[in-house]
C-alpha cells in the first residue's frame, strides 16, 4: 500500500522499470488494513488510498484512486455480524484461476486471490510501455465510488448502485 514515498524512492523505482525491470503494482483506493477501532469498537476509516500517480503517469498507466472494483460474478459471501447471514459483497471479490494470466510465472500456479476494495489499472491512450495484466475481473463488473464501499456495514446497499458495464477490469 504505497503512500508518501520520497522522491528518491520514486526515482529508484522508475529507474528500475525504465532499465527494463518489471513492476507488479497493487493499489488500494480504500486502505482496509489501516482501519482502526475506537475504544467503543466503532470502525474508524483510514481515509487513505495508495498513491503512485507520478510513476503511473510516466509509465502510461491510469488509476482512479476514488474508484473500486465491484464484481457481481466474483463477489465473496461475507457475514457482516456474528449472527448475520452470509451475503455477497460486490466490493470483496474472490478471483479464480481462469481470470489469471496462466502463462506468467507469478500467477500460473495460483488458485484464487481475494481482494477487498481493489483498485483498477488501465493503459493510457498512446502509452508506449508494455502493459501485461496478470489478473482480470469478470465482465459482470463496474467501477464504484470508493467512499460508498468504505466502512460498508450492509453490502446489500451496493446492489442498488450496481450496473454492470460489460467490461473486464485489470
Which ranges hold each PLM region?
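Acidic, S/T/G-rich, low-cysteine, solvent-exposed domains in lumenal/extracellular/periplasmic regions
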Residues: 1-170
Amino acid at each position: 500500500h504505497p503512500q508518501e514515498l520520497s522522491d528518491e524512492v520514486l526515482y529508484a523505482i522508475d529507474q528500475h522499470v525504465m532499465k527494463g525491470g518489471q513492476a507488479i503494482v497493487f493499489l488500494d483506493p480504500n486502505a482496509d488494513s489501516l482501519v482502526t477501532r475506537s475504544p467503543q469498537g466503532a470502525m474508524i476509516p483510514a481515509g487513505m488510498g495508495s498513491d503512485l500517480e507520478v510513476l503511473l503517469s510516466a509509465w502510461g498507466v491510469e488509476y482512479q484512486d476514488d474508484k473500486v472494483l465491484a464484481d457481481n460474478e466474483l463477489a465473496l459471501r461475507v457475514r457482516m455480524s456474528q449472527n448475520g447471514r452470509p451475503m455477497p459483497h460486490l466490493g470483496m471479490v474472490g478471483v479464480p484461476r481462469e481470470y489469471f494470466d496462466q502463462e506468467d510465472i507469478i500467477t500460473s500456479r495460483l488458485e484464487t486471490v481475494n481482494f477487498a476494495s481493489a483498485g483498477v489499472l488501465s493503459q493510457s491512450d498512446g502509452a508506449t510501455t508494455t502493459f501485461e495484466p496478470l489478473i482480470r475481473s469478470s465482465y459482470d463488473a463496474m467501477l464504484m465510488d470508493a467512499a460508498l464501499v468504505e466502512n460498508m456495514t450492509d453490502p446489500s446497499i451496493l446492489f442498488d448502485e450496481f450496473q454492470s458495464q460489460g467490461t473486464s477490469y485489470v
